C-alpha cells in the first residue's frame, strides 16, 4: 500500500480517537466528555446555575456513552475534541436547542505528583467548576468568552483528578475554556483525557 494512503488512513483513525495528551500548545483542554443540552426553567441563568441537574453534579465520574436521565429526556456523555481553545456546545450539538440550556464538560487530569497550580477558565454565559468534587469556581452573570477570565489556585493530587464544568447559556454563543498554569505558563507534565481510569 502506498505510504500516502497509509498516512491518510492513520490520520483518520487518530482524528477519531481522543488524544491522551488532551491539551494544545497553550495548555487549553481540548478533550472533554460533554453532556448537553439540558433545558433550564425560565430565563435566568443566574438562578439556574445553582440547580443540580444530575443529582450529584459535583461528583460525577462519567464514561463515554454513559446515559443520564435529565428533565424527562435521556442524554449520553459524548467525547468531544474541540477545534479551537474552547468548547463550543453549539458546534457539538447543533443549534436546534442552544438557548436557555445547560451543559456539562468533564476532563480527567493525571498528575505525576501533588502540585499547586492555577486553573484559568472562562464561561459564556454562567459557569461553575469542581475539582475532585470540591467547588472551585462560580460565575453567575452573562458575558462573552475570553481566555483566562477567571483564575483560581487549586491542588492536583497524584494520579487521576477530575475537572467538572457546568455552563449555562441564555442566548447566542455557548462556550467554555480551561487550562492549568504554573507561574503563568501551561503545566506540561500532566495528562488530560476524556477517559476515566
Positions of PLM-derived features:
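Bacterial N-terminal signal peptides
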Residues: 4-15
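Accessory carbohydrate-binding/adhesion or oligomerization-edge regions at the termini
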Residues: 18-87, 165-197
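Extracellular beta-rich ligand/substrate-recognition surface
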Residues: 92-103, 140-145
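Residues that act as N-cap/strand-start positions at coil-to-secondary-structure junctions
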Residues: 101-103, 113, 123, 146-148
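Extracellular and analogous surface-interaction loops
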Residues: 105-117, 153-158
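Aromatic-lined ligand-binding clefts that engage carbohydrates, nucleic acids, or primary amines
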Residues: 111, 116-130, 163
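Beta-strand-rich ligand-recognition modules
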Residues: 128-179
